[in-house]
Amino acid sequence: MDFRPRQPVVLREMLLSFSNHCYTILVTNKCEEQRRWFVLVYKLPPEPTRLRASVWRKLRAAGAVYLQNGVAALPADATGERAMRGAAQEVREFSGTAHLLRGEAVGHEAALVGAFGEARDAEYAEVLSKCRDFHAELEKERAAGKFTFAELEENEEDLDKLGAWLRKVELRDRFGAPSAQEARAAVLACREDLEAFAASVYEAADHGSASSASSGP
């Protein structure tokens, strides 16, 4: 798997001051309304590759965007700080180097925010794809007449996983990606489709019970 970022985002004109293994970004034209960011700059040994994969997964789970190889960014909030400090600690435990930066972007911040939106849209697209698969599976069960409680339970588990996946993406979605509402609506449609399938399962069960009763001694 390639852990390099797809498109770098440039943060420029920053002055760095060193303090206790962390850098603080000081921007000359500071504005109180300016959004603040954490930027983690790290380097790991080339081998084994699983170390890089582990850090990449941790940062990706937090919703970080890679500005370039070994440079990741998150909004400077409590969630972002926990994720960045945890990743930095893991890098050091893997005999790598890590510097955590906190500050403001001077220019091009819209591109940085846009990169977060693109990353979340890609994840929402995966949710939408799984929703289509979910509907297709229910249609296959209907066509085969498999209106059983076993099939219902299996599809309920799939829907629970789909809902949990959506919630994880929503937690990473700091800026309201364009596809968010579409993904929520798609998961809701899956739930409604499952309820309709459940009604068919109950109807089939009731019909089977009635048939057994009428054919009894």
Provide a role label for each language-model segment.
Residues 113-117, 148-153:
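Helix-loop elements that line ligand-binding/catalytic pockets
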Residues 159-217:
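Glycine-rich, aromatic-bearing surface loops/beta-hairpins
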Residues 139-140, 144, 151-155:
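Non-catalytic alpha-helical scaffolds and adjoining flexible linkers that form interface surfaces
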Residues 10, 14-142, 164-167, 171, ...:
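Positively charged, polar, low-complexity stretches
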Residues 122, 126-129, 150, 157, ...:
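Alpha-helix boundary/N-cap detector
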